[in-house]
């Protein structure tokens, strides 16, 4: 159906154009390939498996998958059609079927079916024939209607074309040629109604032009000639120079015809499937009429024959032809010949009519008639993915009436494949109208476009070309090819976002990479998740996927490093192998700001004026007043194209005087904010727009009266720091931003106060004015300021009324204001007032000073003061005064005493009587006033009388009077005499005072009281005269002769004029002798004070832990608290020392005097003197001694005497004594003395080496460093006993142990812990004796708990034989845990030793080194200690009751000896000379000599050197042992002593016995040992052993690259004489060859007999070792004498593989020659001489006598 085909083509063309309009810009694929070969990502595949009848005819046929091998069979007829799945289809058959079920069937008989039924008619079935007749009629009617439809459509199209041509012609005639482009002429009247056949339209029931044109057809006269307007006519010159448009059009038409003819010729010689899709009529329109060679040009002869003759001739010709006419087989004729068959596509040509008129339609060339027609004409694949295989069926239909053969050539590219054809019959022949089908397979490896073709060769001369195309709608991105990032500061980062949207019809994945990386070696290496960088640009994301209609933001980071434009090119690649360039551009800029304008006059600093060191600009404001504001306009230009965020900060200036040419240092620049500045700038912060001028207002608003000086700094926020080229080259660049000061403006401004001047500045009202009268005064105020002032006058209305008019207002600059002062006096007298005028915004007001004098009534008194003199008590006195009015105003007055004076006395009633007390005086009048005073109290009267005048000035009259009586008194009536001692006179002072102004006599009487006889009192002076208000000091001396308290003593004093005498009481307590005995608190634990009569506990304690042979001094203080002189004496009862201890002087050594004066000798002599002093003190042999430095003397009055008392001991124990102190007649004082001495009197040091005042620690016994398991080392130690007692030592050795779970030890003993033993160590039992014998053990109560079955008896007084302490049978001791007893490491002998008093004994300490484990490589510290528990065998030495007590055994601190040593393993220092380890690197190919023909070496020895060094101080004895394949030698002799191993025990014993040589290495010496490794073929054979049979120390390792190594590990043993060993690891790595074939089998396929075929196989060496290989041929099947397979070469040498290089290889040529038509199989094995793993190659080949398997160009 032509109409249907045309519609299909139109829809296809429109869709194809739409896809091409929106396709992503592709790039040309690489030369030599028809499709991209780069790997791409998978894209979504939209394909359908549904097929319909239109599959064979539709251009856009859907492909199918490989799993569907055949076309779906036609389903059974259905009543209803299903709705199509595609939303774009226009098929409405399902709707018609549902509505018109009876008229519209589901199945339609197509063109091919109906044509086949009509051609195949002739059936014997009448019904079928009737059906075919009806079908033929229907088809003819259908074609007739289609022809009519096409005729109507063609007629309408031609009519429209003619109307358009006529319109254009008319418009071109009416248009003006030179104004053609400027003037738009109106359209002409349409002529389409005259070009169309209205009757034809009405016949087919269509709308005609008469249906919508209502006007009648006008009558037109004959056409006139064309008349052009004058403006359109050409001038003479223009006509000469111009070319006629008709000529141009003619030339253009001629050229177009030539090109069209050439194009049609090309089309005539090109035959493909696209050409035959066109209808025959359409093609006939494009072709020129063909001329037949058989027809003569002169046809007039046909008109000369008569009709009967012509019919007769034709009849004869028909008879002649019927004899030779027979049906020929058109198969054997070419399809383009006469008998080659007719075309089923093109109708047969019509015979030309006879006559002058012939058909002008073009005829179809028989040579161009197609034989086969492809359906579809183009193999088109869409919506494919990577991986699946797609199929489509191409049907080739025979379009001729003859059965034809064909041959199809497959596609040339690997992406398309052609399956075997499916023919309708056997033999590969296609009947007329029948089709053969070929399955085309599509294997896409990417999502790009693919093009190929299939060639169909037939008997025709032209080949049918079927294009194969794969097109996937590409994604289309809206991303611009140029990404402009704009401007950015150098060192900064600017991010620009671009919207990237996929407006295509498929999903796409995209990858962005630098252009320099294109093409990449691997997409995985460049497909990063983050930014893709190409400095100074970075793009994110670098990999993204976009679905259709989706968008993503592409972020471009621009970080310029240099100034100017930066441009980089990126490649964005799609997964359909299409790429596109993206150009990123940006411009890097630096900050550039300019201050281009400052309003006002230009400011310059004055000469010598200090300015800011860093400011670029200077602005000075004119002096301004307070609270005023001055402004300046600043214009700052941002010269960059980048927005700059800024803010202003106001800082204090950096002022520093500089000499000419001197520069400042940056250290002197300080930045302090100016918080009290008067400057401000607006805006304070904001953003500077790119390349724009910005206006700022600088304001100066002073708020204080001073000069302001500040610096305005413009700070740009977050300005990036440019990276230097050095830092960028070193890779230290980092993005950092900071605020930068880019502009500094120094501003200055001064402030001046408001210049306000009052004229006059003070108003002085002359004369005196009476009160109540208003006084007016005028004045002026000038404003000399630079700004207007606003004033406000104050008011005064408290006493006077003062006002100014006007009170408020404004005075302009340099103007004056007139004011008037109103002053009304309210109080008489002069007044001075300051009237304030407040000036707005002025810190201080303007003051108008006013002075005036007002007066009222004035009264005066004739006297200045009133004196009454001295009065006696009860006396009255009267005085008179005169009051006179001196003013012209009447005055009302009143006089009284001042209330203030009454309150001061205090009195309620005034003693004055005033007559008259009040009255009124007329002007200039006078009156008398009498004032009377009555003396009622003794007092000194000073008061004031007030004269009150109404509205006038008051007057004051002072009054004086003195009223007294006689009075004398003592300052203190009781005297207590302190510090009164028996018989000692004591003086004190008393005071006698005269309380009046009258002179008075006094005298003292006798002492009164019942104790007056025991006392004597003397007063000096005894009598005298006291003047007015006199104080007299008297001396009183009292002597008491009794110690009773004085309480009843009185001394009288008689005074003239007083009725009773004065009495002085005397008291006091006489005291006796008082001496205080104290012990210094600083040196005694218990310090108390003893007072006579108040007994308290007093104790002299020298301490509870006094070290032996250490002086301890305490101070006894005697204080005489009375003025009585007395004697004293000190004495110890038992442990006293001789008094001549201090008198003994140490003899000086015999040496020069100069040497004796040195500091060292002086210290030595001082120590020796102290030792001699202690030896003298302890000479009595009691173990302890106490010595007072002053034993007796005189104690003066109030004297404090400090007496040093020294205590020391040379034997441990607790000592008690009494110190008897006797003072004068006081009772002797007994002071208990206590001292506990601790320490050990036994030491290994000499006595002279003891230190003073501190304990001496025993030096540690060091045994040095010993070898593990060595011999015992013994040290001798001499112990000295400095005590006066024999001391027994029982030794125990311990090892320290620090365990958190063991803190204390509980020791239980039965009997004494350390009994006496004989020399053999047996315990001795002997009776208790006080002096010597068996020891009675008594541990201290502080460290042990004792349990006994007997009751302890108390010991009182001295020791006696009857009071024996019962022996304790069981003792329990609890002590801190420090160590565990150990006797195997350290040992002391003898275990029990007695050191005599003042003598010495010798002990022996031995150390046995322990045996260390082999894991210990370093020396081990062995610490221990020995405790010598001290015991006293003499009971007297142990205890004297009440005097001393000495503990023993565990109760006393033992003698501790620290023992220290080191044990180190027998180990030598090993130094290796090969890479720091004893490792042998060998290759198995080392056994192959340079000439392989000479054979393979049996053994190869490699030697390394080992240096053994003895770094200790002791010699080492050792042997060297090692197993094969390693060996050792020293001094040329080989030693391969083997350690026992599997199968080598006997050999090891033999070699050890034969070479049992012990080596010795002295201290600090070294030895060189040779260690060898033997490589042999025997070792290489181990690699073939199974894994379970691999020998110990042998390991086979193979890397991922195929390299194979044998690793041998052994230990070199150094066996020392102490049965310890030292291990030196040995390792040998042998690289063995690893061969591999490139393939494991070779199949030659089917070959012609006796024809040799060759295949190449590569033999590769994967290891770093050479390989000598040979090829062995296996058994051949079938086994015949003639060998079918052979290899060349069959042996050779493969070099080692280099590091990081591909394996070395050699090409092996495998030859196969078939001897018969049989199947040949064989096996070849590649063997190596070094034990390599063999490689097997299986060979296979088939012989055949078929010549089609014969290779050309071979015999």
From Swiss-Prot:
Any matching Pfam family: Ig_Dlec1_1
GO molecular function, one term: beta-tubulin binding
Entry-linked Gene3D superfamilies: Immunoglobulins (2.60.40.10)
Low complexity bias (residue ranges): 30-39
Residue ranges, compositional bias (Basic residues): 1-12
Entry GO terms, CC: cilium; cytoplasm; cytosol
Summary of the tissues where the protein is detected: Expressed in all tissues examined. Expression is highest in prostate and testis.
Compartments in which it is found: Cytoplasm
Region of interest (Disordered), ranges: 1-39, 1339-1360, 1529-1553
A biological-process GO annotation: cell differentiation
Keyword set, alphabetical order: Cytoplasm, Differentiation, Spermatogenesis, Tumor suppressor
UniProt-reported outcome of changing residue 351 to R: In a breast cancer sample; somatic mutation
Disease linkage: DLEC1 silencing due to promoter methylation and aberrant transcription are implicated in the development of different cancers, including esophageal (ESCR), renal and lung cancers (LNCR). Lung cancer: A common malignancy affecting tissues of the lung. The most common form of lung cancer is non-small cell lung cancer (NSCLC) that can be divided into 3 major histologic subtypes: squamous cell carcinoma, adenocarcinoma, and large cell lung cancer. NSCLC is often diagnosed at an advanced stage and has a poor prognosis.
Function: Essential for spermatogenesis and male fertility. May play an important role in sperm head and tail formation. May act as a tumor suppressor by inhibiting cell proliferation.
Assembly with partners or alone: Interacts with alpha- and beta-tubulin. Interacts with BBS2, BBS4, BBS5, MKKS, TCP1, CCT2, CCT3, CCT4, CCT5 and CCT7.
Name of the protein this chain belongs to: Deleted in lung and esophageal cancer protein 1
Species the sequence originates in: Homo sapiens
């Amino acid at each position: 159906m032509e109409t249907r085909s045309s519609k299909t083509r139109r829809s296809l063309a429109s869709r194809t154009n739409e896809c091409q309009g929106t396709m992503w810009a592709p790039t040309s694929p690489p030369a030599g390939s028809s499709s991209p070969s780069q790997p791409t990502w998978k894209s979504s595949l939209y394909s359908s498996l549904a097929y319909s009848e239109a599959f064979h005819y539709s251009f856009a046929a859907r492909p199918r998958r490989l799993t569907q091998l055949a076309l779906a069979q036609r389903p059974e007829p259905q009543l209803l059609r299903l709705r199509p799945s595609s939303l774009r289809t226009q098929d409405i058959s399902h709707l018609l079927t549902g509505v018109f079920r009876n008229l519209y069937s589901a199945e339609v008989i197509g063109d091919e079916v109906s044509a086949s039924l009509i051609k195949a008619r002739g059936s014997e079935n009448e019904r079928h024939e009737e059906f075919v007749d009806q079908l033929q009629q229907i088809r003819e009617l259908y074609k007739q209607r289609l022809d009519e439809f096409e005729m109507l459509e063609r007629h309408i199209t031609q009519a429209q074309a003619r109307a358009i041509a006529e319109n254009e012609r008319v418009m071109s005639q009416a248009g003006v040629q030179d104004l053609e482009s400027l003037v738009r002429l109106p359209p002409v009247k349409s002529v389409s109604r005259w070009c169309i056949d209205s009757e034809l339209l009405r016949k087919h029931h269509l709308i005609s032009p008469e249906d919508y044109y209502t006007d009648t057809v006008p009558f037109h006269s004959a056409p006139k000639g064309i008349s052009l307007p004058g403006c359109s006519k050409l001038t003479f010159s223009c006509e000469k120079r111009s070319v006629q448009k008709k000529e141009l059009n003619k030339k253009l038409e001629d050229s177009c015809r030539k090109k069209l003819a050439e194009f049609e010729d090309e089309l005539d010689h090109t035959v493909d499937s696209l050409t035959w899709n066109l209808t025959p009529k359409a093609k006939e329109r494009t072709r020129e009429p063909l001329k037949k060679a058989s027809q003569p040009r002169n046809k007039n002869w046909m008109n000369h024959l008569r009709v009967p003759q012509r019919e007769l001739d034709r009849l004869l010709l028909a008879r002649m032809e019927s004899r030779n006419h027979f049906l020929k087989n058109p198969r054997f004729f070419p399809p383009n010949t006469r008998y080659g068959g007719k075309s089923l596509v093109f109708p047969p040509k019509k015979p030309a009519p006879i006559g002058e008129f012939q058909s002008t339609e073009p005829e179809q060339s028989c040579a161009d008639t197609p034989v086969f027609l492809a359906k579809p004409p183009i193999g088109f694949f869409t919506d494919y993915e990577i991986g699946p295989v797609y199929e489509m069926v191409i049907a080739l239909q025979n379009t001729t009436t003859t059965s034809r053969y064909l041959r199809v050539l497959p596609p040339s590219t690997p992406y398309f494949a052609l399956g075997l054809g499916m023919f309708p019959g056997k033999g590969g022949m296609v009947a007329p109208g029948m089709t053969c089908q070929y399955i085309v397979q599509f294997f896409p490896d990417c999502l790009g476009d693919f093009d190929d073709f299939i060639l169909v060769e037939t008997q025709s001369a032209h080949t049918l070309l079927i294009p194969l195309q794969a097109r996937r709608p590409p994604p289309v991105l809206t991303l611009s090819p140029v990404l402009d990032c704009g401007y950015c500061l150098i060192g900064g980062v600017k991010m620009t976002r671009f919207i990237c949207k996929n407006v295509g019809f498929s999903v796409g994945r995209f990858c962005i990479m630098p252009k320099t990386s294109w093409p990449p070696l691997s997409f995985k290496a460049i497909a990063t998740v983050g930014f893709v960088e190409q400095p100074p640009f970075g793009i994110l994301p670098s990999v993204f996927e976009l679905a259709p209609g989706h968008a993503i933001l592409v972020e471009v980071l621009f970080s310029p490093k240099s100034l100017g434009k930066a441009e980089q090119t990126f490649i964005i690649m799609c997964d359909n192998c299409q790429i596109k360039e993206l150009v990123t551009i940006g411009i890097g800029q630096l900050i550039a700001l300019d201050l281009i304008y400052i309003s006002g006059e230009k400011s310059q600093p004055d000469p010598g004026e200090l300015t800011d060191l860093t400011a670029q600009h200077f602005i000075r404001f004119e002096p301004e007043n307070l609270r005023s504001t001055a402004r300046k306009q600043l214009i700052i230009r941002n010269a960059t194209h980048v927005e700059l965020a800024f803010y202003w900060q106001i800082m204090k200036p950096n002022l520093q005087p500089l000499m000419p040419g001197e520069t400042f240092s940056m250290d002197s620049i300080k930045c302090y904010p100016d918080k009290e500045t008067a400057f401000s700038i607006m805006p304070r912060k904001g953003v500077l727009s790119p390349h724009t001028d910005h206006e700022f207002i600088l304001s100066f608003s002073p708020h204080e009266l001073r000069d302001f000086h500040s610096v305005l700094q413009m700070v740009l926020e977050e300005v990036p720091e440019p990276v230097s080229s050095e830092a960028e080259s070193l890779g230290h660049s980092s993005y950092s931003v900071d605020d930068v000061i880019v502009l500094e403006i120094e501003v200055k401004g001064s402030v001046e106060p408001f210049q306000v001047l009052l004229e006059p500045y003070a108003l002085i009202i002359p004369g005196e004015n009476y009160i109540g009268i208003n006084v007016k005064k005028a004045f002026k105020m000038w404003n000399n300021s630079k700004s207007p002032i606003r004033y406000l006058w104050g008011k005064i209305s408290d006493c006077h009324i003062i006002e100014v008019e006007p009170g408020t207002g404004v005075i302009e600059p340099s103007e004056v204001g007139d004011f008037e002062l109103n002053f009304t006096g309210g109080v008489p007298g002069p007044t001075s007032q300051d009237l304030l005028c407040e000036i707005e915004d002025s810190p201080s007001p303007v003051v108008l000073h006013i002075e005036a004098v007002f007066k009222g009534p004035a009264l005066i008194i004739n006297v200045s003061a009133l004196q009454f003199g001295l009065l006696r008590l009860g006396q009255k006195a009267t005085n008179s005064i005169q009051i006179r009015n001196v003013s012209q105003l009447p005055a009302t007055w009143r006089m009284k005493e001042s209330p203030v004076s009454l309150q001061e006395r205090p009195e309620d009633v005034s003693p004055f009587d005033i007559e008259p007390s009040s009255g009124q005086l007329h002007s200039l009048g006078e009156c008398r006033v009498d004032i009377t005073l009555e003396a009622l109290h003794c007092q000194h009267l000073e008061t004031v009388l007030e004269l009150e005048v109404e509205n006038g000035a008051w007057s004051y009259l002072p009054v004086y009077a003195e009223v007294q009586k006689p009075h004398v008194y003592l300052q203190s009536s009781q005297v207590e005499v302190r510090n009164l001692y028996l018989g000692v006179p004591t003086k004190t002072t008393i005071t006698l005072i005269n309380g009046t102004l009258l002179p008075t006599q006094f005298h003292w009487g006798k002492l009164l009281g019942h104790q007056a006889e025991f006392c004597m009192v003397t007063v000096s002076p005894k009598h005298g005269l006291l003047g007015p208000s006199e104080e007299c000091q008297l001396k009183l001396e009292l002597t008491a002769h009794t110690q009773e308290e004085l309480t009843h003593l009185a001394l009288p004093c008689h005074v003239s004029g007083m009725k009773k005498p004065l009495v002085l009481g005397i008291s006091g307590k006489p005291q006796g002798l008082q001496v205080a005995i104290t012990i210094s608190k600083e040196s005694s634990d218990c310090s108390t004070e003893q007072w006579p009569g108040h007994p308290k506990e007093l104790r002299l304690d020298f301490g509870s832990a006094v070290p032996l042979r250490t002086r301890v001094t305490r101070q006894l203080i005697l204080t005489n608290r009375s003025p009585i002189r007395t004697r004293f004496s000190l004495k110890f009862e038992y442990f006293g020392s001789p008094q001549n201890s201090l008198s003994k002087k140490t003899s000086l050594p015999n040496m020069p005097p100069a040497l004796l004066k040195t500091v060292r000798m002086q210290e030595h002599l001082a120590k020796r003197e102290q030792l001699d002093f202690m030896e003298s003190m302890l000479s009595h042999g009691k173990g302890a001694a106490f010595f007072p430095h002053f034993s007796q003397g005189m104690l003066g009055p109030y004297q404090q005497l400090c007496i040093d008392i020294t205590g020391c001991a040379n034997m441990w124990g607790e000592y008690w004594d009494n110190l008897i102190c006797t003072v004068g007649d006081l009772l002797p004082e007994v002071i208990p003395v206590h001292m506990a001495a601790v320490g050990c009197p036994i030491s290994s040091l000499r006595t002279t080496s003891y230190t003073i005042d501190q304990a001496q620690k025993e030096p540690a016994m060091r045994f040095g460093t010993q070898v593990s398991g060595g011999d015992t080392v013994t040290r001798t130690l001499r112990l000295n006993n400095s005590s006066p007692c024999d001391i027994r030592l029982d030794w125990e050795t311990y090892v320290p142990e620090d365990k958190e779970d063991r803190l204390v030890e509980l020791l239980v003993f039965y009997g004494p812990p350390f009994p006496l033993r004989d020399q053999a160590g047996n315990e001795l039992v002997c009776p208790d004796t006080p002096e010597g014998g068996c020891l009675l053990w008594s541990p201290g109560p502080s460290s042990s708990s004792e349990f006994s079955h007997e009751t302890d008896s108390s010991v009182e007084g001295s020791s006696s034989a009857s009071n024996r302490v019962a022996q304790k049978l069981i003792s329990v001791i609890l002590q801190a845990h420090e160590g565990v007893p150990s006797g195997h490491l350290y040992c002391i002998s003898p275990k029990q030793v007695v050191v005599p008093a003042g003598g010495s004994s010798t002990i022996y300490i031995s150390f046995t080194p322990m045996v260390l484990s082999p894991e210990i490589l370093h020396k081990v510290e062995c610490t221990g200690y020995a405790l010598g528990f001290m015991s006293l065998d003499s009971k007297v030495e142990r205890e004297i009751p009440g005097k001393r007590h000495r503990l023993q055994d565990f109760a006393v601190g033992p003698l501790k000896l620290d023992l220290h040593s080191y044990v180190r393993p027998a180990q030598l220092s090993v130094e290796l000379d090969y890479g720091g380890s004893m490792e042998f690197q060998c290759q198995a190919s080392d056994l192959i000599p340079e000439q392989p023909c000479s054979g393979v070496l049996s053994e190869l020895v490699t030697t390394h050197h080992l240096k053994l060094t003895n770094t200790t101080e002791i010699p080492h004895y050792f042997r060297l042992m090692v197993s094969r394949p390693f060996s050792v030698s020293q001094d040329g002799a080989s030693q391969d002593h083997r350690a026992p191993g599997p199968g080598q025990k006997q050999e090891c014993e033999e070699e050890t016995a034969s070479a049992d040589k012990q080596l010795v290495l002295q201290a600090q010496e070294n030895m060189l040992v040779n260690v060898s490794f033997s490589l042999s073929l025997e070792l290489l054979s181990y690699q073939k052993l199974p894994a379970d049979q691999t020998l110990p120390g042998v390991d086979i390792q193979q890397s991922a690259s195929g390299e194979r190594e044998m690793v041998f590990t052994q230990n070199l043993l150094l066996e020392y004489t102490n049965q310890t060993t030292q291990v030196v690891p040995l390792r040998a790595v042998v690289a063995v060859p690893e061969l591999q074939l490139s393939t494991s089998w070779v199949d030659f396929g089917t070959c012609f007999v006796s024809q040799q075929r060759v295949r190449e196989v590569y033999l590769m060496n994967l290891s770093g070792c050479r390989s000598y290989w040979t090829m062995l041929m296996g058994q051949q099947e079938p086994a015949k004498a003639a060998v079918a397979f052979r290899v060349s070469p069959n042996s050779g040498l493969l070099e080692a593989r280099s590091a990081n290089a591909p394996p070395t290889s050699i090409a092996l040529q495998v030859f196969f020659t078939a001897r018969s038509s049989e199947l040949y199989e064989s096996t070849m094995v590649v063997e190596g001489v070094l034990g390599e793993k063999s490689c097997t190659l299986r060979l296979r080949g088939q012989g055949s006598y078929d010549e089609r398997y014969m290779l050309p160009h071979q015999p």
